[in-house]
Amino acid sequence: MKTKTSLILTVAALALSGSALAEVKIALVAKSLGNGFFEAANVGAQQAAKELGDVKVIYTGPTTTTAEAQIDVLNGLIAQGVDAIAISANDPDAVVPVLKKAMQRGIKVVSWDSGVAPAGRQIHLNPSNNALIGETNVKLAADALKALNVEKGDVAVLSATPTSTNQ
């Protein structure tokens, strides 16, 4: 997690390296606040910001996992004049218009974890692929059940949001 978050911030900082700004403001936009995965990403982002120096990470996101709520957050960040937005999108297409607006204003846009359609970003950092994640999860679950001598049972699959690109 820390490596991936450091990579995201480094890419965003390098994209802004020609800027004369004293401090680079990078918004780390989660699918939703209060999610342990994104809280861990924030910890890594804050650490990477310290290591890079002159980088301020603004960790934010909606309280609900809807595209509309995320769009509201993005509009606020554009109004604040952040230098870069690193987003894990709730919906890959719905956020494109607001991210295009951000890019038109010179804001660098990176998607990570759950990607944004190419028209709404400059780069996407994919931490893994869905097939590998699914295969690994099933193998780990099967191994754990086998260790407990469980040979039969029901399986439930939980997902974050149906519109996420990584679900």
Regions found by a protein language model. Give the residues of each.
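Bacterial N-terminal signal peptides that target proteins for export
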Residues: 1-8
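A residue-level marker of the well-folded mature domains of exported/periplasmic proteins
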Residues: 10-12, 21-167
